[in-house]
From Swiss-Prot:
It comes from the Bacteria. It holds the Pfam family Kinase-PPPase. It comes from Burkholderia thailandensis (strain ATCC 700388 / DSM 13276 / CCUG 48851 / CIP 106301 / E264). This is Putative phosphoenolpyruvate synthase regulatory protein. ADP binds at residues 151-158. GO terms for molecular function: ADP binding; ATP binding; phosphotransferase activity, phosphate group as acceptor; protein serine/threonine kinase activity.
Length: 271
C-alpha cells in the first residue's frame, strides 16, 4: 500500500504541494496524495484531523502531512493528528520574524490575493497573448512577445508557452518549424525581425515518434525516420541561426520555463 501524503492549506494548497513534490521526489517511492485546501475554520481543522486519523488506521501507518496553515489554533489541532506533520509556515516564518525583528501578517492565503492587482492583469494579458499566438496561428503583434518558442510539431512548445504565461506573466508566442522551412534552409519569414526573442525546443526523435503516434498512428508524420529527419534539421537550423535551444525530453515544464527565463534574461515574479 502506498504511503498517504496530505497537503493541508488554508488556501489553494499550491505552495504546500509544490514544496511536497520537491521533497518527495528525492525518494524512490510512489505516494498517494490527498489535497485538503481551504481549511479556514476550527471546524474544518477538526474534520481534517479525522481524515488523517482514518487514513492512519486504514493504512496501518502514519500519513505524512505537509501544511501551510497560518492560523495558529488550526495548526495546533492538525499537529495532534496521528501523522508526521511538516509545518512549513512555522519552520520558515518564525526564524524570519526573529531575524528581521518583525511580526508577519499571519494573513491566510495572502500570496494568492491578487485578483485586483496589476500582476493579475499582466498574467491574464500574457495568457491571452499566448493563446492567440499558439502554433504560429497569428503573426500580428509578434513584436510584443517576450519570447517566441520554435521547434518541430509536438516538441512541447504549447504547454511551455502557457506555463510561462500563467506562472510568470510572460507573453510567449510559439511557432512551428515544418519540412518546408528545412527545404528552404531558413527560418520562417515572420520570425526574421524577431531573432533576438527566439528560443528553441528539441526532443529525442523516438520520444517524438511516440507522442505523434498517439495523435496520428501509423502516419509518415509519426514515423521514426521522419522524426529523426525533422529533429536533425531543426537543430541544425537553430545552430546555424544562432538560436539558443534545449531538449525537452527529460525535463519538466517547470525546468524548461526556468531555463528559458535565465537564457533570455527575463526577470519575472512567479504568481
Amino acid at each position: 500500500m502506498l504511503p498517504t501524503v496530505f497537503i493541508v492549506s488554508d488556501g489553494t494548497g499550491i505552495t504546500a504541494e509544490t514544496f511536497a513534490h520537491s521533497i518527495l521526489s528525492q525518494f524512490d517511492q510512489k505516494f498517494r496524495l490527498v489535497r485538503v485546501p481551504f481549511i479556514d475554520s476550527i471546524e474544518k481543522a477538526y474534520g481534517t484531523v479525522q481524515k488523517i486519523d482514518d487514513a492512519a488506521q486504514h493504512d496501518g501507518r502514519r500519513p505524512i502531512v505537509f501544511t501551510t496553515l497560518v492560523d495558529g489554533e488550526s495548526n495546533e489541532i492538525v499537529k495532534r493528528s496521528n501523522a508526521l506533520v511538516l509545518d512549513m509556515f512555522q519552520r520558515f516564518v518564525e526564524p524570519l520574524e526573529q531575524e528581521l525583528q518583525l511580526k508577519s501578517s499571519h494573513a491566510m492565503g495572502r500570496v494568492h490575493q491578487n485578483a485586483d492587482t496589476e500582476e493579475y492583469k499582466t498574467r491574464i494579458e500574457a495568457i491571452n497573448f499566448s493563446l492567440a499566438h499558439d502554433d504560429g496561428q497569428s503573426n500580428r503583434n509578434l513584436a510584443d512577445a517576450d519570447v517566441i518558442l520554435i521547434g518541430v510539431s509536438r516538441s512541447g512548445k504549447t504547454p511551455t508557452s502557457l506555463y510561462l504565461a500563467m506562472q510568470y506573466g510572460v507573453k510567449a508566442a510559439n511557432y512551428p518549424l515544418i519540412p518546408e522551412d528545412f527545404e528552404r534552409g531558413k527560418l520562417p519569414t515572420p520570425l526574421h525581425p524577431h531573432r533576438d526573442k527566439l528560443f528553441g525546443l528539441s526532443i529525442d526523435p523516438m520520444r517524438l515518434s511516440e507522442i505523434r503516434n498517439e495523435r496520428r498512428p501509423g502516419s509518415k508524420y509519426a514515423a521514426p525516420e521522419n522524426c529523426r529527419y525533422e529533429i536533425n534539421e531543426a537543430e541544425a537550423m537553430m545552430r546555424r541561426e544562432g538560436v539558443k535551444w534545449l531538449s525537452s525530453t527529460h525535463k519538466s515544464i517547470e525546468e524548461i520555463a526556468t531555463t528559458i527565463l535565465q537564457e533570455i534574461k527575463l526577470e519575472r515574479q512567479s504568481y
